[in-house]
């Protein structure tokens, strides 16, 4: 018989840098999960993606065991990295703070495709382009 899921916890953590300090400790501790075991497994799985924020979805079972799924980094993180900027514009209507090329946009769309609600790279590119526009990042041809 399958184990019963008692909680699903969603966190966004730096790749390879999970530790028992907040936000990880309190979020997992209240469900009785072994925090150090999670940190070691998460860091091992994400060590090749250093410098990125990796969202994780942790399923906690009634016997206090857990499984987790790592997602792709948020589009905004990938766009700021590609554009070489620290953060997006506070007011995207007034002007752009950077730009990315179509090739970079396509690369980001291919990376994000498994987590987006679309099936083609073309539609994924339109979604990512909209995110870039809202951040004040121009897409050049």
From Swiss-Prot:
Checking SUPFAM superfamilies in the record gives:
Ribosomal L11/L12e N-terminal domain, Ribosomal protein L11, C-terminal domain
Task: Give any Gene Ontology cellular component.
Answer: cytosolic large ribosomal subunit
Annotated Pfam families: Ribosomal_L11, Ribosomal_L11_N
Please give the organism: Synechococcus sp. (strain CC9902)
List, alphabetically, the CDD domains matched. Ribosomal_L11
Q: How does it assemble?
A: Part of the ribosomal stalk of the 50S ribosomal subunit. Interacts with L10 and the large rRNA to form the base of the stalk. L10 forms an elongated spine to which L12 dimers bind in a sequential fashion forming a multimeric L10(L12)X complex.
Highest taxon listed in the record's lineage: Bacteria
Q: What gene, per UniProt, encodes this protein?
A: rplK
Q: Which PANTHER family match?
A: 60S RIBOSOMAL PROTEIN L12 (PTHR11661), LARGE RIBOSOMAL SUBUNIT PROTEIN UL11M (PTHR11661:SF1)
Which UniProt keywords are given for this protein, alphabetically ordered? Methylation, Ribonucleoprotein, Ribosomal protein, RNA-binding, rRNA-binding
| InterPro entries on file | Ribosomal_uL11, Ribosomal_uL11_bac-typ, Ribosomal_uL11_C, Ribosomal_uL11_C_sf, Ribosomal_uL11_CS, Ribosomal_uL11_N, Ribosomal_uL11_N_sf
Q: Name one GO molecular function term.
A: structural constituent of ribosome
Q: How is it modified after translation?
A: One or more lysine residues are methylated.
* The protein's role, per its UniProt record: Forms part of the ribosomal stalk which helps the ribosome interact with GTP-bound translation factors.
The entry's family comment says:
Belongs to the universal ribosomal protein uL11 family.
One GO process term, biological-process aspect: translation
- NCBIfam families reported for this sequence: L11_bact
Protein name per Swiss-Prot or TrEMBL? Large ribosomal subunit protein uL11
